[in-house]
From Swiss-Prot:
Induction: Expression is chronologically prohibited with ages. It comes from the Eukaryota. This is Atrial natriuretic peptide receptor 1. SUPFAM superfamilies: Nucleotide cyclase, Periplasmic binding protein-like I, Protein kinase-like (PK-like). Phosphorylation of the protein kinase-like domain is required for full activation by ANP. Residues 1-32 form the signal peptide. Belongs to the adenylyl cyclase class-4/guanylyl cyclase family. GO terms for molecular function: ATP binding; G protein-coupled peptide receptor activity; GTP binding; guanylate cyclase activity; hormone binding; natriuretic peptide receptor activity; peptide hormone binding; peptide receptor activity. InterPro entries: A/G_cyclase, A/G_cyclase_CS, ANF_lig-bd_rcpt, ANPR/GUC, Cyclic_nucleotide_synthase, Kinase-like_dom_sf, Nucleotide_cyclase, Peripla_BP_I. Keywords: cGMP biosynthesis, Chloride, Disulfide bond, Glycoprotein, GTP-binding, Lyase, Membrane, Nucleotide-binding, Phosphoprotein, Receptor, Signal, Transmembrane, Transmembrane helix, Vasoactive. Its EC number is 4.6.1.2. Residues 33-473 are extracellular.
Length: 1061
């Protein structure tokens, strides 16, 4: 690689020296409560990913979030000032950018600089800000040179960088076994700011340093075909794994020429470094991604050539927060910047500016909280580095040098339809390659080509240049080898035939049609539930039967009349390779009373499963955590010995090791014999690991050396099994759960992190054992020793257990008989306790149902009857709401609004209990009540609602708002009488709803009413006059939407009552 190109010239250093003295005299700054962000980005040219038209909306969204969150810079105002990094031609300039930065520093003394994004523009500005001790934050400037913190001490990159691309390629080389040679080509185009040069520079330096391999590089001009010819002559002598940075059209041209030259066969692979996915049409959508397609008559050849091509891009975030952010970003860009933003990977740049700015604001907030100032650039920058942050682009991690860990995607062509799709993703945070489920890299030979030809690039391997043997020598050699081969084959042929016959017979195969769900499984499936005794991953659970027996179940079924345990396998299909067939054969060969018997396996998609012996007593973990089961030490030693015997058989057999030994994989049969399950069949292990808390909880038994491996062996190791046994031994001894640490309440994740870290002394469970168990504690410590070589084998463990368990070596039968008597007594108490709990829960459920639905409707549902909709000839409906509620809500916090409505409707609910009415619903500030249904009350419904309305109005006059005690709550009420239809709507959260024009008219009476008055329709007035005693006042004709002019009345009060409207 040629020497690094300095992104800024010496004239800028002189400019810096001339401008610094007056800058040092500058006293103006970011005053308390006012933080200034200086933006140095292209303001006119929107072709840059970091142009202000793209980044500006993202900054606006970030500042809006800061303003909305009280925990970020409380009492401060954040403002932005703009400076252009473009010259007069609209191109990023290494002169315009630093001048703009100096002007902004002089005029505004900002607390932070945002941008530039272009490499040559960012270099001088980064040096200036380091000298000024002002942080610089950018999602551009991806070149390798910005990682030199001697020059760019306060530069933080929240976006992708080319050095991280090198990390991805290094991981890819390790995965594919390319550890000797690579070739990198980069295109040069006038005016392109040497984008490809800086990209290949980061790739070149990082891959060479990470892998210590030979990396060659070549530059070519995109518009000069003679350069393409020169490249094609050089490629066969320089590399087989080739990385190319160029435009999509140039890459296609180069691939077509390579096809003509015979370089697109199985010996070559070409990676197009198209980081923004321009050749893939960008964006999201169902359209096929065919970068080879142009419609120019060469598509057939181009598709053939692209079979040897892969494409590397940034990973497109697909989290919901990012998708919602894009919607807001596009809308804001169009509304405020008159810019139409298209879909594409380029949108990750403004999103990264958004996340970076929020991270900076968080760092400033923390600095202020610790007594610092916004001008303490070094402290603020250090708070941003080596830190994780959840942003709209997902999980954002800034490393210790201020660079974001970047995710990448590898695209490959589907040979069936020619479309490119993602087959591999790289997680920059964990530095792991994650294959996309159901997809794989396409290789002509079925495997990756070697990075160096078999005989070297120039046939320099001496093995390929030996002189040819004579014909006689060849014949003699062939004859000797043939004779030797015949003797060897004759010796093994019979044994091999027998083995092949056994493999071909497939005695292990189970047809899914022969597997019948057990009665227990059918009952659980029909009930829509699954019962388990422990929530920590056990495959077995326990329940209480009507016979008073403690039954234990897994996913069970009947196969050939026998009850078996069924373990579902999370795979789409199982390829029956010889490796898999041998695994199945080894499982059938296992015959040991302390290992669950392998019944067979079903490989018929989608019902892929493993059938094993069913042990009805559940797992060891279940038994240890069930406090109702008493375990004396004789019984515990018996269980421990069973584990040792089973593991001793595994370690001495063809399976060699377990790899997943834990208490939930130790099950107990009906005779209380412990058996180990879930061993062998590594090809049947689930592909997709569980996430979150569960994955850490399942690793609590895993040895530290296996935890530190990126891809530990599926079978684990024998020393790892001994470590797992030590953890189980502590579970059995203390019965306090897995990995119990006295005095500490740690999550599984915290435990795994401390074990993996390798503390001194090693972090292990507690050993708070009784005095007579000291020898058992010493055995545990030896089993979970940090050095695998120091752990004893199971043969030695067996001898050790025999030494200090001699006094408990009597027959276990007497102990089992007494224990079964204890179970019978305990189960009677459990049945009574759970019956009472059931009755209490039934009472609570009925009370809740009566609150949701009318009593008569609820009783129908309890009897299993269908609630039919019912028509009512005459009911009276009440509507009310709060005048000015919208304005009141805007001036109050959400909690104050919730408190207000809760106080008000609690008051209302207490009032309406005194009347023959039914509360239908409350929505926001609206309150709806009806009388006359579901139980008819003749014509009394109007009187009941009128009296209730007067009572509510009286209660409102004395009601006080907690956070505004001086204000009077203004209630507006409307009442109407007429026919309705009522019924229960929905299955989930069913509601008793009213339908009909009467409901709409009652709502119109409320909306056309006045505050603190009761508005009546003429229909309600007519019913009230039948009873007399109510004071009414004619309001007149009111224009109502959809009704025309309607004559209405005010309800003033009831004669003989103190309540008045």
């Amino acid at each position: 690689m040629p020497g690094p190109r300095r992104p800024a010239g010496s004239r800028l250093r002189l400019l810096l020296l001339l401008l610094l003295p007056p800058l040092l005299l500058l006293l103006r700054g970011s005053h308390a409560g006012n933080l200034t962000v200086a933006v140095v980005l292209p303001l006119a040219n929107t072709s840059y990913p970091w142009s202000w038209a793209r980044v500006g909306p993202a900054v606006e969204l970030a500042l809006a979030q800061v303003k909305a969150r009280p925990d970020l810079l409380p009492g401060w105002t954040v403002r932005t000032v703009l400076g252009s990094s473009e010259n007069a031609l609209g191109v990023c300039s290494d002169t315009a950018a630093p001048l703009a930065a100096v002007d902004l520093k002089w005029e505004h003394n900002p607390a932070v600089f945002l941008g530039p994004g272009c490499v040559y523009a960012a270099a001088p500005v980064g040096r200036f800000t380091a000298h000024w001790r002002v942080p610089l934050l950018t999602a551009g400037a991806p070149a390798l040179g910005f990682g030199v913190k001697d020059e760019y001490a306060l530069t933080t990159r929240a976006g992708p960088s080319y050095a991280k691309l090198g990390d991805f390629v290094a991981a890819l080389h390790r995965r594919l076994g390319w550890e000797r040679q690579a070739l990198m080509l980069y295109a040069y185009r006038p005016g392109d700011e040497e984008h490809c040069f800086f990209l290949v520079e980061g790739l070149f330096m990082r891959v060479r340093d990470r892998l210590n391999i030979t990396v060659d590089h070549l530059e070519f001009a995109e518009d000069d075909l003679s350069h393409y010819t020169r490249l094609l002559r050089t490629m066969p002598r320089k590399g087989r794994v080739i990385y190319i940075c160029s435009s999509p059209d140039a890459f296609r041209t180069l691939m077509l020429l390579a096809l003509e030259a015979g370089l697109c066969g199985e010996d070559y692979v070409f990676f197009h470094l198209d980081i923004f996915g321009q050749s893939l049409q960008g964006g999201q959508g169902p359209a096929p991604r065919r970068p080879w397609e142009r419609g120019d008559g060469q598509d057939v050849s181009a598709r053939q050539a692209f079979q040897a091509a892969k494409i590397i891009t940034y990973k497109d975030p697909d989290n919901p927060e990012y998708l919602e952010f894009l919607k807001q970003l596009k809308h804001l860009a169009y509304e405020q910047f008159n810019f139409t933003m298209e879909d594409g990977l380029v949108n990750t740049i403004p999103a990264s500016f958004h996340d970076g700015l929020l991270l900076y604001i968080q760092a400033v907030t923390e600095t202020l909280a610790h007594g610092g100032t916004v001008t303490d650039g070094e402290n603020i920058t250090q708070r941003m580095w080596n830190r994780s942050f959840q942003g709209v682009t997902g999980y954002l991690k800034i490393d210790s040098s201020g660079d974001r860990e970047t995710d990448f995607s590898l695209w490959d062509m589907d040979p069936e339809n020619g479309a490119f799709r993602v087959v591999l993703n790289y997680n920059g945070t964990s530095q792991e390659l994650v294959a996309v489920s159901g997809r794989k890299l396409n290789w002509p030979l079925g495997y990756p080509p070697p990075d160096i030809p078999k005989c070297g690039f120039d046939n320099e391997d001496p093995a390929c240049n030996q002189d040819h043997l004579s014909t006689l020598e060849v014949l003699a050699l062939v004859g000797s080898l043939s004779l030797l081969g015949i003797l060897i084959v004759s010796f093994f042929i019979y044994r091999k035939m027998q083995l092949e016959k056994e493999l071909a017979s497939e005695l292990w195969r189970v047809r899914w049609e022969d597997v019948e769900p057990s009665s227990l499984e059918r009952h659980l499936r029909s009930a829509g539930s699954r019962l388990t005794l422990s929530g920590r991953g056990s495959n077995y659970g326990s329940l209480l039967t009507t016979e008073g027996q403690f039954q234990v179940f897994a996913k069970t079924a009947y196969y050939k009349g026998n009850l078996v345990a069924v373990k579902r396998v999370n795979r789409k299909r199982i390829e029956l390779t010889r490796k898999v067939l041998f695994e199945l054969k080894h499982m059938r060969d296992v015959q040991n009373e302390h290992l669950t018997r392998f019944v067979g396996a079903c490989t018929d998609p989608p019902n892929i499963c493993i059938l094993t012996e069913y042990c009805p007593r559940g797992s060891l973990q279940d038994i240890l955590e069930n406090e109702s089961i008493t375990l004396d030490w004789m019984f515990r030693y018996s269980l421990t010995n069973d584990i040792v015997k089973g593991m001793l058989f595994l370690h001495n057999g063809a399976i060699c090791s377990h790899g997943n030994l834990k208490s939930s994989n130790c099950v107990v049969d009906g005779r209380f014999v412990l058996k180990i399950t879930d061993y062998g069949l590594e090809s049947f292990r689930d592909l997709d690991p569980e996430q979150g808390h569960t994955v850490y909880a399942k690793k609590l038994w895993t040895a530290p050396e296996l935890l530190r491996m990126a891809s530990p062996p599926v079978r684990g190791s024998q020393a790892g099994d001994v470590y797992s046994f030590g953890i189980i031994l502590q579970e059995i001894a203390l019965r306090s759960g897995v990995f119990h640490v006295e005095g500490l309440d740690l999550s599984p994740k915290e435990i795994i992190e401390r074990v993996t870290r390798g503390e001194q002394p090693p972090f292990r469970p507690s050993l708070a054992l009784q005095s007579h168990l000291e020898e058992l504690g010493l055995l545990m410590q030896r089993c979970w020793a940090e050095d695998p070589q120091e752990r004893p084998p199971f043969q030695q463990i067996r001898l050790t257990l025999r030494k200090f368990n001699r006094e408990n070596s009597s027959n276990i039968l007497d102990n089992l008989l007494s224990r079964m008597e204890q179970y019978a007594n305990n189960l009677e108490e459990l049945v009574e306790e759970r019956t009472q709990a059931y009755l209490e829960e039934k009472r609570k459920a009925e009370a809740l149902l009566y609150q949701i639905l009318p009593h008569s409707v609820a009783e129908q549902l309890k009897r299993g009857e269908t609630v039919q909709a019912e028509a009512f000839d005459s009911v009276t409906i009440y509507f009310s709401d709060i005048v000015g509620f919208t304005a009141l809500s805007a001036e109050s916090t959400p909690m104050q609004v919730v408190t207000l409505l809760n106080d008000l409707y609690t008051c209302f609910d207490a009032v309406i209990d005194n009347f023959d009415v039914y509360k239908v619903e409350t929505i926001g500030d609206a309150y709806m009540v009806v009388s006359g249904l579901p139980v008819r009350n003749g014509r009394l419904h109007a009187c009941e609602v009128a009296r209730m309305a007067l009572a509510l109005l009286d209660a409102v006059r004395s009601f006080r708002i907690r956070h505004r005690p001086q204000e009077q709550l203004r209630l507006r009420i409307g009442i109407h009488t007429g026919p309705v239809c009522a019924g229960v709507v929905g299955l989930k959260m069913p509601r008793y709803c009213l339908f009909g024009d009467t409901v709409n008219t009652a709502s119109r009476m409320e909306s056309n009413g006045e505050a603190l008055k009761i508005h009546l329709s003429s229909e309600t007035k007519a019913v009230l006059e039948e009873f007399g005693g109510f004071e009414l006042e004619l309001r007149g004709d009111v224009e109502m939407k959809g009704k025309g002019k309607v004559r209405t009345y005010w309800l003033l009060g009831e004669r003989g009552s103190s309540t008045r409207g």
